[in-house]
């Protein structure tokens, strides 16, 4: 029994001496020389700044999740192109007065990530969506403030999803 353990330990030490080691697959993600161009996303929705907000949240989330490279459109290694296809609001529940009480805001995004040097598409996805609820009332400012907060939340959630995928890709 002891002999089997000693043989197993000897094999482990021999394998570690050969130069093999476990390493994270995200070495490029943390490489400070990597440049990513995350331009404002094209906006096909009725929300005026939707494309710019989603791209800004994506840059923030990439930094937060450990990206150490730089952002810029001069000499990038990777190009992130996106399009906000729609931001729609649907009535989710009605109050006693038959007016909407709770609404559901949905963000739909298309994204494409290109490796500039090789010219290949690393990732392309259409119809990614995130949803958040918000309350509405008789006061238009109250409703619009809640709608904006819901939009900021779904933009943040979308950025987290995109950032997690980019972390795996890079």
Predicted feature locations:
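Sec-dependent bacterial lipoprotein signal peptides
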Residues: 1-17
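A generic short-segment signal for beta-strand/edge and adjacent turn/coil regions
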Residues: 5-8, 39, 47-54, 75-83, ...
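A structural "domain/chain start" motif
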Residues: 16-59, 63-67, 71, 140, ...
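Conserved acidic
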Residues: 46, 50, 101, 146, ...
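Short secondary-structure transition/capping segments
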Residues: 112-126, 158-169
